[in-house]
Regions:
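Residues within helix-turn-helix
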Residues: 35
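Structural recognition of an alpha-helix C-terminal capping motif at a helix-to-coil junction
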Residues: 39-46, 50, 58-70
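A short, charge-rich alpha-helical start-of-domain segment used by transcription regulators
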Residues: 2-25, 29, 38
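Arg/Lys-rich amphipathic alpha helix in sigma70-family domain 2
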Residues: 69-83
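Sigma70-family region 2
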Residues: 4-5, 32, 45-59, 78-80
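Short alpha-helical functional segments enriched in proximate histidine and acidic residues
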Residues: 26, 30, 47, 71, ...
């Protein structure tokens, strides 16, 4: 593992610990299912990890909420499409 990767790993861990409850609560308010909110919050951090090459450390807060909003929108869209 190179130094840059190790630095991002530390940054990612810090972000997860710092923001996971905010993201989970943001999602839970919008979908009203606490257990599903937990799963979707995990998906937010998976997407952050998948796009780590494009993450700007100064704007990670807004990026996390943008990802969360998009995941919630997708979930709601799929729900109504099934009905």
């Amino acid at each position: 593992m190179n130094k840059q990767q190790a630095t991002f790993d530390d940054f990612f861990s810090e972000c997860y610990l710092k923001y996971k409850e905010y993201i989970k609560n943001y999602i839970a308010i919008r979908i009203c299912h606490p257990h599903e909110a937990e799963d979707l919050a995990q998906d937010v951090f998976v997407r952050l990890w998948e796009h780590r090459a494009f993450v700007n450390k100064d704007t990670v807060w807004s990026l996390l909420f943008t990802i969360a909003r998009n995941i919630v929108t997708d979930k709601i869209r799929r729900y109504y499409k099934q009905e």
